[in-house]
Amino acid sequence: MRWPWSGDDHEQNKSSRLWATSPKSSDWPSTLVEPRTLIATLALTVSTVAGVRLYKTYLRRIPTVNHIKPNYFRRKSLFGQVTSVGDADNFRLYHTPGGRIAGWGLLPWKRIPTKREDLTKQTLHIRIAGVDAPELAHWGREAQPFSKEAHDWLINLIHNRRVRAYIYRRDQYDRVVAQVYVRRWLFRKDVGLEMLRAGLATVYEAKTGAEFGTVEDKYRAAEQKARDSKVGMWAKPTLRQRLGGAPTQPPESPREYKNRHNAAEKLKKPG
């Protein structure tokens, strides 16, 4: 006797329908080329390839200059946070692709390190393109006038801030030469241009390695205006400074300073 509440007839009919619509083992090849199967497979493949490409193009972090592909130069920009300012025209950048939109600074696994040991081999050494700032004391050379002021000015402008670097090339010191922008309030500022306007840098004058992008004329005009306005290193010494022995002639440019020291060091070498 059939159990009155079992519903066996309904379950049996449902099972029969499922088996009737299920493909037989011999039908699998034809099932794989059905439009709905092909569309689903194509959609999965396209989304996977697009995701990988999106990651490699926009979200892959570049820890050091050795990880920059040659075809990136003059085509890509790098967004990140300045972790240190070593000199008046270069700094260290921790690359944060995608910025806050990608979770940097917000998600626990996307925190920017603060300890020096955690930043080892994790930052890019950026050289600001198109400008040359007064040299700090190093390698036994004396500091140039206004080198500390220029260094302090750059620290105040970019240290611990997010910047975007439009990368041009890798130089002989494994630095990335780049035009750098920083946002202050609602405005985006060209760091090199602002240094020239403040009279704390000159246009880069080396015979080789100069990089300006499309702004060389603008940079030269900014330097000339700073000279004419007597700001920064171009300011005339006060009476007190002159009495204290400050030079009254035009200041030595960073390029002249380097040339003078390089010539003196060559004379010291034997032979």
UniProtKB/Swiss-Prot annotation:
Q: Which GO terms describe its cellular component?
A: membrane; mitochondrion
Where composition is biased (Basic and acidic residues), the residues are: 253-271
Where is the protein found, in the record's own terms?
Answer: Mitochondrion; Membrane
Where does this protein chiefly localize?
A: mitochondrion
Q: Where is the composition biased (Polar residues)?
A: 15-27
The catalytic residues are R127, E135, R175
Q: Which residues form the signal peptide?
A: none
Topologically, how does it sit relative to the membrane?
Single-pass membrane protein
GO MF term (any one)? metal ion binding
Keyword Chaperone included in the entry's annotation = no
Q: Which residues form a coiled coil?
A: none
TNase-like domain: residues covered: 76-236
User: According to its UniProt record, what is one Pfam family this protein matches?
Assistant: SNase
Give the residues the record marks as binding Ca(2+): D132
Q: Which UniProt keywords apply?
A: Calcium, Endonuclease, Hydrolase, Membrane, Metal-binding, Mitochondrion, Nuclease, Transmembrane, Transmembrane helix
The family database entries (InterPro entries) matched by this protein are listed as:
SNase_OB-fold_sf, Staphylococal_nuclease_OB-fold
Disordered as annotated region, ranges: 1-27, 226-271
Q: Where are the transmembrane segments?
A: 38-55
Family note:
Belongs to the LCL3 family.
This protein is called Probable endonuclease lcl3
Species the sequence originates in: Pyrenophora tritici-repentis (strain Pt-1C-BFP) (Wheat tan spot fungus)
Q: What is the name of the gene encoding this protein?
A: lcl3
